[in-house]
């Protein structure tokens, strides 16, 4: 399996067992009667229809085959489906554009996952589940860089690191690494500086790091990701506005967070296998 990096790269838990609001009389018009599989108002009876992009990229989906369950979002999708009571064979995959998914209106899916950041603006048009991912910060460099192969934050104290102004990435250089950053107007300017050897590494969120290291930077690599602080964009499963299963889907995400399933998936697909190890102190 060729790992071709390409475009686009937790919180307090409310256990699924406690999500009883969906059975209250005043909410039965917008939510399923319960979160039992037989009671879920899915697009197709007895099936769970999940959408992703066309194409879907590594490391979110491997080889553009979400049905394999390989890749971070492929694995998350099946974990949520199983938590809701659906077997893998009862999952149906469809494809949508990113913009089409976030536009108000009827949907041909029960939920969609394409690294949708949860924002107030989008929440006016669609529903989101509880977050299944909070994007950490990562350091992009290139193979001949002096920081290539470094495995700890301590080894980066004297490195020339840059980030875009006003970003969480800039804060991470100062607060997590303890270095004085070079500040750029945007990531594009930072990439140019990296290519010209003016900086050793550019700090961006991990999804952006996958893209930059695979597409924009020759011989690019991800030195590593910084330990998560809980800050950063949060991704949620996207559902139609006022979907009858939003509460149940959120409950499933909360449950796989609570039992460690989500952490294991994250470690496998967005750290160990993705070539983006978490840097040691």
Language-model features: locations:
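Extended ligand-binding regions for polar small-molecule ligands
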Residues: 23, 74, 82-83, 234-272
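Acidic, polar ligand-binding/catalytic clefts
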Residues: 90-153
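Ligand-binding clefts/hinges and TM-proximal coupling segments of bilobed small-molecule sensing domains
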Residues: 29, 38, 90, 169-182, ...
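Periplasmic-binding protein-like
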Residues: 54, 134-141, 210, 214-251, ...
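Bilobed "Venus flytrap"/periplasmic-binding protein-like clamshell domains
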Residues: 50, 69-83, 116-117, 135-191, ...
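Extracytoplasmic small-molecule ligand-binding "clamshell" domains
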Residues: 31-112
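C-terminal motif of bacterial Sec signal peptides marking the signal peptidase cleavage site
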Residues: 17-21
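A ligand-binding cleft/hinge motif common to bilobed small-molecule-binding domains
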Residues: 100, 116-125, 200-231
């Amino acid at each position: 399996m060729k790992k071709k990096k390409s475009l686009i790269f937790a919180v307090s838990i409310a256990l699924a067992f406690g999500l009883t609001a969906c059975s209250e009389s005043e909410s039965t018009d917008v939510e399923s009667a319960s979160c039992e599989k037989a009671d879920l108002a899915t697009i197709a009876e007895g099936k769970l229809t999940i959408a992703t992009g066309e194409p879907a990229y590594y490391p979110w989906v491997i080889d553009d085959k979400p049905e394999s369950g390989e890749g971070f979002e492929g694995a998350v999708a099946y974990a949520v489906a199983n938590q809701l009571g659906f077997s893998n064979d009862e999952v149906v995959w469809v494809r949508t554009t990113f913009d089409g998914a976030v536009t108000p209106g009827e949907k041909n899916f029960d939920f969609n996952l394409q690294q949708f950041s949860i924002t107030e603006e989008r929440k006016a048009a669609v529903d989101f589940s509880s977050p299944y991912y909070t994007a950490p910060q990562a350091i992009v460099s290139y193979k001949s860089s002096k920081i290539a192969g470094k495995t700890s934050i301590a080894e980066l104290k004297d490195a020339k690191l840059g980030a875009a102004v006003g970003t969480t990435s800039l804060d991470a250089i100062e607060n997590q690494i303890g270095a004085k950053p070079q500040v750029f107007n945007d990531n594009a300017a930072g990439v140019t500086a990296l290519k010209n050897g003016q900086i050793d590494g550019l700090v961006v969120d991990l999804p952006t790091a996958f893209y930059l290291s695979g597409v924009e930077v020759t011989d690019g690599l991800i030195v590593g990701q910084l330990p998560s602080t809980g800050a950063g964009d949060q991704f949620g499963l996207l559902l139609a506005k006022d979907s009858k299963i939003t509460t149940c889907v959120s409950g499933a995400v909360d449950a796989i967070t609570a039992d460690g399933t989500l952490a294991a998936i994250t470690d496998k697909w967005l750290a160990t296998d993705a070539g983006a190890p978490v840097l040691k102190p």
